[in-house]
């Protein structure tokens, strides 16, 4: 694939850069199409991205419809058929600014002013369209073979909410139509698995703008799943000596100044509330509260390790564009814990946390994940606590422990928490990009800030080390992950309704009610569908909408024999004695069998 660089030379494109160049060129072709249809359009930035491209554009008061996006895409195809040559040129600063001013490219002019040290600027031209760009690009527009405009959204100029809101138009581009078709198939699968779609169908959770964006509410069915997850992880933690606590959802601003959140994390926090001369804030994390619980009484080395756990309500200000159902909201419940230990106990505590993570993943059949050692960016003094010695010690300690434990990991700069390095376990969901579920963070910073101590064997006071860890991450995100992995077909122990009783007709309603009562007595979550509908409709509703693990189809034959006809989600049926069926289901519940 031939590409042209800003100095005008043409060469073969390195294979690992092909998609980037294709997508960057697609952004220019889209901008040209927009300019033809909307001559007053004023363009900001239009880069290639990991999965496609976008362009931010100021369209004045014009609001684009889906039909408008289709027209832009149609014009893009016209431009590719014109097979316009893509040619670079370079201008000195004064001429470059004049060119952009003449073309009414106000955002480009402002951007050039920001690049005060640049003496010249490069441009690429195709037909009548000119864009300031460093390239490289395809040599002709006809080389752009497969693309699609996907959506529009809002974006602030320079990502600053004080600036004008622009229209961001997104698209995708690939080498050929086959790759685009494969992407569209993947997108269809993503839509079918989307936890927001399934959550609505199953009545798991809801959102309402009157309540607030990013503030989902769990309905009875969804809260049942949520409670089962809570019970599961608390049992695991209790078996490992965790002590569970409950702390307030707010704290004073001074609390977060002490912890450092106010200096390093304030942009992710909600504004402070003033009450009786004191400032309070919704908590984004639970660390400060747990530090105060440890500080509540004196400690000896004999008390350590001390493991404090909580299913805690947290609140973070997320921009509206990043919100996604229960996967990412402004309120969530974190499976949080803080482990206070001596330096000598770091290895064993990290090992126990890792074992708990991997044991949990095995229970939920999670196999596609990778471990990342997230480190600070030493150049970013604003984001991270400024103590080089502490950071070097903490990063080396966690790196050594993970290496000794034989855990394969990669390292990523700039992804640490502000107070210390961490192990992130990133999962690859059924569709979409990977994200972090579990974390284990090593912290020498907060214990010192809160003046935490313990009396060591030699009688001297020392500062404990703290491990911050979350196994399920937030229960909300973990539930979203499970919904998309299973398409809502939860294993029996997690399912909101574990058995649905379906009487064939009114004649077997009394028998169905008796069976329902017996299942309830056995501790099974059961629902009786006594609607006056045909049995085929009832089966489809239970199987395809409610995704119930088991359906009992009860007709005259079953009522007479005193047994049940069992139908599972796969459509397989068998006849069983009532007690036999109850034993099967209760065993799956007790053992938390992962069958879906």
Locations of regions flagged by a protein language model:
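NTP/phosphate- and nucleic-acid-binding module
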Residues: 1-42, 50, 56-596
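Conserved P-loop NTP-binding catalytic core
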Residues: 45
């Amino acid at each position: 694939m031939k590409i042209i660089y800003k100095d005008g030379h043409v060469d073969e494109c390195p294979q690992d850069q092909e998609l980037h160049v294709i997508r960057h060129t697609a952004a220019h072709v889209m901008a040209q199409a927009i300019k033809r249809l909307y001559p007053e359009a004023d363009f900001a930035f239009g880069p290639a991205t990991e999965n496609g491209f976008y362009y931010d554009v100021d369209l004045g008061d014009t609001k684009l419809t889906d039909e408008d996006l289709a027209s832009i895409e149609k014009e893009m195809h016209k431009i590719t058929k014109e097979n316009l040559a893509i040619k670079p040129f370079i201008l000195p600063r004064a001429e470059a600014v004049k060119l952009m001013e003449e073309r009414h490219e106000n955002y480009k002019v402002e951007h050039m002013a920001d690049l005060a040290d640049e003496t010249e600027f490069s441009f690429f031209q195709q037909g009548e369209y000119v864009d300031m760009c460093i390239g490289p690009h395809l040599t002709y527009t006809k080389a752009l073979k497969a693309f699609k405009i996907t959506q529009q959204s809002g974006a602030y100029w320079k990502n600053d909410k004080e600036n004008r809101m622009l229209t961001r138009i997104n698209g995708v581009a690939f080498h050929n139509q086959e790759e685009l078709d494969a992407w569209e198939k993947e997108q269809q699968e993503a839509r079918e698995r989307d936890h927001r779609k399934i959550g609505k169908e199953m009545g798991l959770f809801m959102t309402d703008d009157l309540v607030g964006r990013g503030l989902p509410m769990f309905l009875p069915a969804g809260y049942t799943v949520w409670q089962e997850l809570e019970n599961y992880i608390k049992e695991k933690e209790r078996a490992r000596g965790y002590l569970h606590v409950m702390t307030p959802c707010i704290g004073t601003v001074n609390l977060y100044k002490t912890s450092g959140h106010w200096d390093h994390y304030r942009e992710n926090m909600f504004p402070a509330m003033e009450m009786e001369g004191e400032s309070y804030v919704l908590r984004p994390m639970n660390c400060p509260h747990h530090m105060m619980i440890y500080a509540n009484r004196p400690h000896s080395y004999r008390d350590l390790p001390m493991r404090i756990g909580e299913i805690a309500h947290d609140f973070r200000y997320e921009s509206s564009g990043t919100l996604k159902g229960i996967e990412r909201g402004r309120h969530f419940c974190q499976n949080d814990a803080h482990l206070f230990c001596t330096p000598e106990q770091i290895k064993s505590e990290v090992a126990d946390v890792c074992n708990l993570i991997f044991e949990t993943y095995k229970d939920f059949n999670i196999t596609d994940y990778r471990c990342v050692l997230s480190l600070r960016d030493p150049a970013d003094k604003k984001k991270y606590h400024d103590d080089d010695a502490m950071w070097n010690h903490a990063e080396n300690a966690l790196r050594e422990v993970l290496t000794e434990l034989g855990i394969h990991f990669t390292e990523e700069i700039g992804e640490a928490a502000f107070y210390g390095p961490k192990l992130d376990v990133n999962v690859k969901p059924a569709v979409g990009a990977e994200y972090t579920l579990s974390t284990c963070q090593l912290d020498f910073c907060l214990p010192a800030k809160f003046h935490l101590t313990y009396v060591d064997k030699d009688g001297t006071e020392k500062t404990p080390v703290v491990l911050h860890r979350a196994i399920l991450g937030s229960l909300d995100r973990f539930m979203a992950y499970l919904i998309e992995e299973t398409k809502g077909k939860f294993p029996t122990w997690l399912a909101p309704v574990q058995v649905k009783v379906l009487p064939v007709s009114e004649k077997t309603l009394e028998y169905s009610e008796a069976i329902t009562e017996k299942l309830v007595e056995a501790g099974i979550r059961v629902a009786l569908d006594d609607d006056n509908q045909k049995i085929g409709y009832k089966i489809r509703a239970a199987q395809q909408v409610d995704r119930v693990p088991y359906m009992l189809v009860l007709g005259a034959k079953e009522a007479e024999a005193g047994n049940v006809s069992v139908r599972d989600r796969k459509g397989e049926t068998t006849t069983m004695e009532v007690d036999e069926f109850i034993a099967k289901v209760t065993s799956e519940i007790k053992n938390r069998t992962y069958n879906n």
